Amino acid sequence: MRTSNYLLSTLKETPNDAEVVSHKLMLRAGMIRKLASGLYTWLPTGLRVLRKVENIVRQEIDNAGAIETLMPVVQPFELWEETGRSEKMGPELLRFTDRHERPFVLSPTAEEVITALVRNEVSSYKQLPLNLYQIQTKFRDERRPRFGVMRAREFCMMDAYSFDIDKAGLEKSYEAMHVAYCKAFDRMGLDYRPVLADTGAIGGNGSHEFHVLAESGEDLIAFSTESDYAANIEKAEAVAPAIERPAPTQAMTLVDTPNAKTIAELVEQHGLPIEKTVKTLFVKASDEIDAPIVALIIRGDHELNEIKAEKLAEVASPLEMASEEEIRALIGAGPGSLGPVGLKLPFIVDRTVAVMNDFGAGANIDGKHYFGINWGRDVELGKVEDLRNVVEGDPSPCGKGTLMLKRGIEVGHIFQLGTNYSEKMNCGVLDSNGKNVILEMGCYGIGVSRVVAAAIEQNHDDYGIIWPDAIAPFQVAIVPMNMHKSERVQQAAEKLYAELTAAGIEVLFDDRKERPGVMFSDMELIGVPHTIIIGDRSMDEGHFEYKNRRQGEKEAVAMESIIDFIQAKLA
């Protein structure tokens, strides 16, 4: 491709609304342009990368035995009513009516559509297992689209759906897709981790997320230092401390704390170690208990894991914190002065808090705390659960090593749905005994457009993008120095361009009438992995200059050896 015939569209300045590195560089490199909030046009450079990611995904999903199909972006609303997800998805599900007042939605995912298809097309166990996928545009009406294509409203996604006669078959399909994901991300040259995950709104029995590691990642991932264990922080178990609760050494005392409305203020003003404090959080209760509110008690330096809390039978779902007005009406004190002693409401204690002694907590009186609280002596312990997020140094749930935390960008997710959708939509087949069996489903997604952004977050420097070879928009750039002033340079560049192209190599030939500095800057910005520099001086010495984008070092390569040299680099 010649730049003179190409829409390069690079920018010197970064638009003001770009926040993360990938958004800034995708705009500056001429990969995308914003049309409206969360909506982007993919320019030629960006589309080349997107298509390469798509093709790698397609090849590996094909190799896993899945079959490609294509479903409509517009879906009948009635299908979503069959599964009950019409309300669960909330406002992210964009709804509209056609001219005949029939309700439709723009597809955020396709569980309902694919299940309806299979229940009509598949009738016998002999047609199983079956795994169908598509690579298609999706739409989710994000409340706050941000970070460019990382969290856009419209995005490109690979979504696959497996159907099996039993759970053993589902597990086999799930494992095959897990392997396919790893192969795809390996080929893309990404540093990623598959991690245990919560099933979220899609539901099901088992789930893994695939995260590209990057400091800008929105998710925290917990890893074992001595095993392959990895989990999203929402899913990672905080193992119960392997100690017995120490005996009391202090008497419980009531202390005036008029200016300590937070744990930090309590620690600063009264010298109490933060690991000797607890915080009491009031949340709405479920119908399972005879109380409007239930209290959750965690250590002062720990954070409540809302996903874990929401799964407790006593807690309403979705999780909702009690308001200050509700708390005062029940307790007579505000949120900064709450604790378990004398509490007339049900409460649940975190595992770590259950082994604490001599700790401090609110006295359920404004401006007062109890110090030296001990379980059993001052208040009954009650129910103990895992309520908190893990922290670095916690024991790994696998029993090997401790946990470390890193940030990740979720680019893929796989679920064992079981019969969650197939039962609601009556999707079954006749087994070998002629009995109708509801199918076991799996669903699998890769955010193709998000992969592009995640790769940039992981591969960039001060000059621009550093693409892994497999997904770079071009493999090689030719930068001829002052070509329009030197016929010899022009002839050499044209000859090399023709030879590389004939060898099946994707080349960007910068034939613009631009200063060399501008040409070099653009090639570094868009991230072409290999650059060949042609100039009169180097040709006088019988060589071209080669520059590797990742290493940044220049190397002299004999003119007659350049094709073999480049082919070896790309092998």
Curated annotation (Swiss-Prot):
GO terms for biological process: prolyl-tRNA aminoacylation. Catalyzes the attachment of proline to tRNA(Pro) in a two-step reaction: proline is first activated by ATP to form Pro-AMP and then transferred to the acceptor end of tRNA(Pro). As ProRS can inadvertently accommodate and process non-cognate amino acids such as alanine and cysteine, to avoid such errors it has two additional distinct editing activities against alanine. One activity is designated as 'pretransfer' editing and involves the tRNA(Pro)-independent hydrolysis of activated Ala-AMP. Homodimer. It comes from the Bacteria. Consists of three domains: the N-terminal catalytic domain, the editing domain and the C-terminal anticodon-binding domain. Belongs to the class-II aminoacyl-tRNA synthetase family. ProS type 1 subfamily. The keyword Ribosomal protein does not apply. The keyword ATP-binding applies. Gene3D superfamilies: Anticodon-binding domain, Bira Bifunctional Protein, Domain 2, YbaK/aminoacyl-tRNA synthetase-associated domain. Keywords: Aminoacyl-tRNA synthetase, ATP-binding, Cytoplasm, Ligase, Nucleotide-binding, Protein biosynthesis. Its EC number is 6.1.1.15. It is an enzyme of class 6 (ligase). One of its GO terms (molecular function) is proline-tRNA ligase activity. PROSITE patterns: AA_TRNA_LIGASE_II. It is found in: Cytoplasm. This is Proline--tRNA ligase. It catalyses: tRNA(Pro) + L-proline + ATP = L-prolyl-tRNA(Pro) + AMP + diphosphate. GO terms for cellular component: cytosol. It holds the Pfam family tRNA-synt_2b. NCBIfam families: PRK09194.1 (NF006625), proS_fam_II (TIGR00409).
